[in-house]
């Protein structure tokens, strides 16, 4: 039994010595040597498009408040250029193709609304003339106005005075038609202004996308900086 313990002890000692030799045989490598080699950065620099977009928006906001339609169209154009500078290249191309498909439809709708507005405006003018004439005729009959022709006075005939109720109804209808036409024309003006703004935005966006490198050589629209020659 004692010999078995001695033999077991010798085996454990030899195993421990072997593990110690294997551990010492490992070579320690310095951390700086184990790091991968460093290369010069070759990735493109971050795009300056967001900065340009902010500058364009600041330009648009620092102008006047945009009370007129021309100033509102100017702000819409500034916003479209800023959006084009901010978007990704692929998204920019997708928007350009969509705008090219939508613009003819918007222009067609704009032409139809303008024709409709012209018809309503003409109807408004006719109703205004009818309301004015009926008002003058009714007022003259009620006040028994006498007209002088070649030195002789001529009063309004009785049969014409009997038309006052009908003229009053016509005057009321013309006035109501004027109110309806004015409201419709105002609504059409808002729709036309909105469509004009959309057309301006989409055209400005497409113009910004098609801008050549010679016009914007330092900040091209592909999202990367170009070296100045």
Curated annotation (Swiss-Prot):
Record-level GO BP terms: symbiont-mediated suppression of host innate immune response
InterPro entries xrefs: Orbi_NS3
Keywords carried by this UniProt record: Host cell membrane, Host Golgi apparatus, Host membrane, Host-virus interaction, Inhibition of host innate immune response by virus, Membrane, Transmembrane, Transmembrane helix, Viral immunoevasion
Transmembrane segments: 119-139, 162-182
Domain of life, source organism: Viruses
Places the protein is found: Host cell membrane; Host Golgi apparatus
Membrane topology label: Multi-pass membrane protein
GO cellular component: host cell Golgi apparatus; host cell plasma membrane; membrane
Matches recorded under Pfam families: Orbi_NS3
Family label: Belongs to the orbivirus NS3 family.
Function recorded in the entry: Plays a role in the inhibition of host innate immune response. Interacts with host OPTN and thus inhibits the recruitment of TBK1 to the host Golgi apparatus. In turn, downstream partner IRF3 cannot be activated and IFN-beta production is impaired.
Subunit structure of this chain's protein: Forms homooligomers via coiled-coil motif. Interacts with host OPTN; this interaction inhibits innate immune response.
Protein name per UniProt: Non-structural protein P8
Protein species of origin: Bluetongue virus 1 (isolate South Africa) (BTV 1)
């Amino acid at each position: 039994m004692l010999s078995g313990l001695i033999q077991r002890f010798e085996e454990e000692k030899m195993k421990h010595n072997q593990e110690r030799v294997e551990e010492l045989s490992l070579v320690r490598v310095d951390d700086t040597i184990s790091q991968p080699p460093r290369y010069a950065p070759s990735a493109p620099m971050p795009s300056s498009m967001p900065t340009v977009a902010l500058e364009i928006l600041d330009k648009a906001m620092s102008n006047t408040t945009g009370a007129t339609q021309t100033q509102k169209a100017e702000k819409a154009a500034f916003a479209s250029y800023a959006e084009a500078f901010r978007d990704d290249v692929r998204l920019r191309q997708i928007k350009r193709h969509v705008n090219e498909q939508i613009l003819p439809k918007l222009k067609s709708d704009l032409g139809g609304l303008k024709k409709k507005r012209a018809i309503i405006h003409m109807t408004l003018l006719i109703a205004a003339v009818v309301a004015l004439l009926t008002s003058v005729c009714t007022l003259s009959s009620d006040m028994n106005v006498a007209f002088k022709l070649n030195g002789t006075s001529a009063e309004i005939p009785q049969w014409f005075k009997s038309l006052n109720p009908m003229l009053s109804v016509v005057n009321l209808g013309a006035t109501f038609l004027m109110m309806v036409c004015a409201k419709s024309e105002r609504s059409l003006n808002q729709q036309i202004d909105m469509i004009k703004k959309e057309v301006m935005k989409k055209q400005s966006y497409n113009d910004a996308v098609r801008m050549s490198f010679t016009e914007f050589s330092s900040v091209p629209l592909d999202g990367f900086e170009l070296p100045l020659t």
